[in-house]
């Protein structure tokens, strides 16, 4: 719909043959109907795909105020955008709720691209929220800006340099809403890193289990929960990820667990000892 909007707004659009215009109108109405159905299904409410659907509706609403069967195109676009943004972003914690540190990076770019007026509808100040998302990247990266390999995050993924600007004196951070606790210790030459997932349920782009662990010591990774060694765009990446559970979770009675987790607590005992507690539902 975004491409079709650009075509229609081009000065040469009115010179097109009527048969082509009719085909374009038919395609646009089919798209409006499909996105309206997606909205009613609520299936994409906690995914970035829902945001893209909503933005497509808002784009085409510049030209088509009403779709087939009296659909209010802009109203659905606005409501869909508000709902899906709240589904993929924790306004309280300033992070993406999609179960992948890679998608936190996409979340930064996505928020940057959305008009301020729509973000303000759900209580987000664009610049302030992006700053908080960038601050969170301190906890989502280990050495050399490498992203913590959680869920659909390739082990070779990195955060952009301009999106890792913070430094922290604290070593322990829990994102309760995001379902993640991180212990991070930096020295001049290395970073020691531990992360544990304790989400209430699987999020988009996450593995189908709970309580997976990531462990790095002296810049070497010992345990990972990742989308594998394949870069984005590789056919193998998606197949590898979707066929896998996280690679380091306990099997109870030789069976994987898919019902989410309950976070109990996290605390620092002394300078080098930390306790993170969670349990399977």
Show which residues each predicted segment covers.
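Extended polysaccharide-engagement surfaces of secreted carbohydrate-active enzymes
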Residues: 97-281
